[in-house]
Amino acid sequence: HWIKAGIDKKIELRLGPAMSTLDDLIKEGPEDYFDMAFIDANKKDYDHYYERVLTLIRPGGLIVIDNVFWSGRVLDKKNHEKSTSSIRSLNKKILHDQRVSLSMLPLNDGVTLIWKRP
């Protein structure tokens, strides 16, 4: 769809494991390069993705994280399943992260919009 939109020169598609792809992007540099990133991958590694993406996003850039409500399971304090605990933990971390501002949207399974502060 981005070819039809005429923005194919601005998008680079990379297919592969998220963690190693992010590590490759960091190695290739430069930091603060990307305008936007969308995180929707292995939930237990969300915190690792967040920290790596935060390095890659320019000040003023946007990070979008999907599934932040995890079908409501993040609200069940008795649920200690790894993916649920990871998302719950990241939600709390982002809320108190002075590097960013955020807005959590109740769309479908929850989406967090994160703005990287200058």
What residue ranges belong to the model's regions?
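S-adenosylmethionine/decaboxylated-SAM
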Residues: 1-118
